């Protein structure tokens, strides 16, 4: 019961912070994006990179297809972002206001992943594939991660030099 109350409280708080981030970003261009663009969905061959796992293609902000390539501490992520945007800008203009969306999108992904499992929990394959999902430890760690995201959402967006 306490985990449900904690989860409900933190997700409600996060929705407010996510809304704030989208307000700060303002109007942004909606383009066709991969939707789940991360290093594991890039297949490298002798002919160069190929994007795979296209079942999540949607319309959204360009930054959605960039932020999953960022890792490490804030300084590392800023350097990586600078490199990504340098390459990206050779093909398409990037609206830097979208930087306000990075942590909001990360938070939504965390919440949506959990919701995706919960919605499918009645499928017998899901309890077998995700046995940890019904354990208190998972929910305690997930709530802690969401609280950490709440703190990150209070920080200014990543900057590039």
What are the roles of these predicted feature ranges?
Residues 1-35, 152-159:
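An alpha-helical support segment within catalytic cores of ATP-dependent transferases
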Residues 62-94, 109-125:
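Active-site activation/catalytic loop segments of kinase-like enzymes and analogous catalytic loops
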Residues 12-15, 82-85, 140:
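Hydrophobic core segments within long, regular secondary-structure runs in both alpha-
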Residues 19-66:
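Active-site acidic catalytic loop and adjacent metal/ATP-binding pocket
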Residues 2, 115-161:
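ATP/Mg2+ or Mg2+-diphosphate-binding catalytic cores
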Residues 96-106:
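All-alpha amphipathic helical-bundle segments outside canonical DNA-binding/catalytic cores
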Residues 12-19, 89, 115, 147:
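Structural signal for well-ordered, non-membrane alpha-helices
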Residues 7, 11, 84, 101-102:
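A structural signal for short hydrophobic/aromatic patches embedded in well-ordered alpha helices
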């Amino acid at each position: 019961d306490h985990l449900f109350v904690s989860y409900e409280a933190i997700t409600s708080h996060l929705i407010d912070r996510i809304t704030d981030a989208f307000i700060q970003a303002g109007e942004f261009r909606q383009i066709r994006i991969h939707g789940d663009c991360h290093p594991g969905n890039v297949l490298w061959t002798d002919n160069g990179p190929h994007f795979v796992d296209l079942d999540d293609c949607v319309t959204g902000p360009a930054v959605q297809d960039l932020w999953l390539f960022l890792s490490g501490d804030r300084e590392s992520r800023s350097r990586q972002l600078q490199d990504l945007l340098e390459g990206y800008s050779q093909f398409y203009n990037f609206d830097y206001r979208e930087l306000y969306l990075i942590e909001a999108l990360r938070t939504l992904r965390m919440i949506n992943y959990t919701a995706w499992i919960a919605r499918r929990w009645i499928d017998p394959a899901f309890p077998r594939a995700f046995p940890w999902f019904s354990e208190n430890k998972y929910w305690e760690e997930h709530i802690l991660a969401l609280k950490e995201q709440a703190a990150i959402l209070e920080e200014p967006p990543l900057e590039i030099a």
